[in-house]
Amino acid sequence: MSKEKFVREKPHVNVGTIGHVDHGKTTLTAALTKVLSEKYGGEKKAFDQIDNAPEERARGITIATSHVEYQSDKRHYAHVDCPGHADYVKNMITGAAQMDGAILVVSAADGPMPQTREHIVLAKQVGVPNIVVYLNKADMVDDKELLELVEMEVRDLLNSYDFPGDETPIIVGSALKALEGDKSEVGEPSIIKLVETMDTYFPQPERAIDKPFLMPIEDVFSISGRGTVVTGRVERGIIKVGDEIEIVGIKDTTKTTCTGVEMFRKLLDEGQAGDNVGILLRGTKREEVERGQVLAKPGSITPHKKFEAEIYVLSKEEGGRHTPFLQGYRPQFYFRTTDVTGQLLSLPEGIEMVMPGDNVKVTVELIAPVAMDEGLRFAVREGGRTVGAGVVTKIIE
């Protein structure tokens, strides 16, 4: 049996490193690939391979990210590491690399620093469910009490942003030593301990297919003698012929029944997460449905106009605005498949204006309701040009 085949059978989890600049996130990423490839097979990546992160685009925004993979005894991990602080902010807000759990890297020599705090805040805002801590550069700290002090500081910081700081696992080690093949406690064993902790502390995420059905509507057709067909890509769950579904967003919510599912012009019994399908709706007129609405399992999602969000505003160099904007700013918010105009009702206290390149918490009111839940991503656009990205952090009404 080939090794590659074996990898696929383990459950898959997405993780990433977060933390202050130069605290060792990329070194730890390299150490994870080295130590685990030696133990479980797979490819090891050198520091500079990871550090030269390729650029990718998500929601019209360019982000530099490195993707590596490794496996533990129980799982297959896909791990994302970003070279610069701005890339982390953009990555977390756009959800370009969704994280089921984050590894917070803190230098034992420096303790928590401004970006440590900022990354914890962002992780909370964008819904990263769990954090484990790797207290790095422990080989540079001889004083056991100092280590304990840093550990307490990190726990307090996590607690202050509603993560369970007291229960959070903290692994003490040196990513550099592990990379050099050091077998002492802070070396390779700390990496094995970290991944074993991730295996137990990060719960297995619910698969998209097991969640309630949702499909954003991309197009609507009328087929004579058969009725109305809507097309799109199933985002989550399963749709079966005969299922009752709701049409949510833009207008009042209505109920209908799925009377047919087709893919590649073939009729199917069901469509599932990831499929591009056409869904035939019973008794629904073509003008009653439009792009921007969603089909969903009844009661699973509701339409809203007013919400809080964390947004990243593109800098001028990234093709964004050249000037700041104020409260009352009215761009379009692109949710899933359509633009909806909205207004910035409020900015954080003491912030008069938002500069290109900033990330900020805002309250938005849309002119039409959109099917949303917390964690939904969107783009901020002006006349079709992307000027920012955001994530819904709290629904107001």
From Swiss-Prot:
G4: annotated segments: 136-139
InterPro entries: EF-Tu_GTP-bd, EF-Tu_GTPase, EFTu-like_2, EFTU_2, G_TR_CS, P-loop_NTPase, Small_GTP-bd, T_Tr_GTP-bd_dom
Transmembrane segments: none
Keyword Metal-binding (UniProt): yes
Binding site for Mg(2+): 26
GO molecular-function term, one example from the UniProt record: GTPase activity
Class of the enzyme per the UniProt entry, highest EC level: hydrolase
Catalytic activity: GTP + H2O = GDP + phosphate + H(+)
Residue segments, region G3: 81-84
UniProt keyword terms in alphabetical order: Cytoplasm, Elongation factor, GTP-binding, Hydrolase, Magnesium, Metal-binding, Nucleotide-binding, Protein biosynthesis
Start and end residues of each tr-type G domain: 10-206
NCBIfam families cross-referenced by the UniProt entry: EF-Tu, PRK00049.1, PRK12735.1, PRK12736.1, small_GTP
Quaternary data: Monomer.
Job description of the protein: GTP hydrolase that promotes the GTP-dependent binding of aminoacyl-tRNA to the A-site of ribosomes during protein biosynthesis.
The protein's name in its UniProt record: Elongation factor Tu
